[in-house]
């Protein structure tokens, strides 16, 4: 058990290194396969020992060995987070086929979080492809294809209707098309109950964190908040703690129905 956990954590670090490549290159419409990893300032190809996850960044003290330009701390952070997600996935799902699907989903959320945070875009290469992959996986694994299909419709259509109403009332967008596609992808992988949970939790995070940032920075209400970051966090929580979060959602709905005299 310990050996399997350590292997998965190490694998997560390696995968995290690749995710960093995706995070940097996808917004710039560059190939994620070629050229080999290189310094983005002096373009020198990295040696193998400069590509070891986390340790290379620490060894190089966060700077290129040749031009001494700074290497973003995002690189080891993404690698450590991915390693932790792989480790957590092992304890949550065991060595099962579902583990592979959940880890693929987690990797997509990490990349979307980082890209949306920095560039405020959610690449179709991930969201649209993720919708297809999530639905195909649901044909053989949880949540099942019916729940997945409903999740796609709820994740993509319901927020779109809310955003359209917001646009007509306020005169500017509250959510972008990328957010709808990302939520549809969440629905494809996790099914309709958990896409509801994801939507609710992400909205709460957006109000609390986004509102706090706007208040502290004193920016106008027209400032765009990268909502995809909140979706990613909420979706990962839903994926890894599906049982407790679904139960909490059902209790909240039941409490509301009781309060409203409908149950």
Question: Residue spans of the language-model regions?
Answer:
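Interfacial loop-to-transmembrane junctions
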Residues: 176-178, 211-237
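C-terminal ends of transmembrane helices
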Residues: 20-26, 61-69, 109-121, 161-173, ...
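Select subsegments of transmembrane alpha-helices in polytopic membrane proteins
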Residues: 73-80, 124
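Functional transmembrane core segments of multi-pass inner-membrane proteins
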Residues: 8, 98-99, 104-205, 248-263
């Amino acid at each position: 058990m310990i050996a399997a956990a350590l292997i998965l954590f190490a694998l997560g670090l390696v995968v995290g290194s690749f995710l960093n490549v995706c995070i940097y290159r996808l917004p710039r419409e560059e190939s994620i396969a070629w050229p080999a990893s290189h310094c983005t300032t002096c373009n020198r190809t990295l040696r193998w020992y400069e590509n070891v996850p986390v340790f290379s960044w620490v060894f190089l003290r966060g700077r290129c060995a040749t031009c001494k330009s700074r290497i973003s701390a995002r690189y080891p952070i993404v690698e450590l987070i991915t390693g932790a997600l792989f480790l957590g996935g092992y304890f949550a799902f065991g060595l099962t086929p579902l583990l592979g699907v959940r880890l693929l989903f987690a990797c997509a959320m990490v990349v979307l979080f980082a890209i949306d945070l920095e560039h405020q875009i959610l690449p179709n290469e991930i969201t649209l492809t993720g919708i297809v992959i999530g639905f195909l996986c649901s044909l053989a694994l949880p949540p099942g294809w019916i729940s997945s299909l409903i999740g796609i419709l709820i994740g993509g259509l319901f927020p779109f209707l809310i955003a359209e109403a917001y646009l007509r009332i306020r005169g500017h967008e509250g959510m972008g098309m990328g957010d709808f596609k990302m939520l549809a992808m969440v629905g494809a992988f996790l099914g309709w109950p958990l896409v509801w949970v994801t939507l609710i939790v992400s909205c709460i995070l957006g109000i609390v964190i986004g509102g706090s940032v706007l208040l502290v920075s004193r920016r106008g209400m027209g400032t765009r908040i990268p909502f995809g970051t909140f979706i990613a966090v909420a979706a990962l929580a839903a994926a890894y703690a599906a049982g407790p979060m679904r139960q909490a959602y059902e209790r909240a709905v039941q409490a509301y129905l009781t309060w409203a005299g409908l149950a």
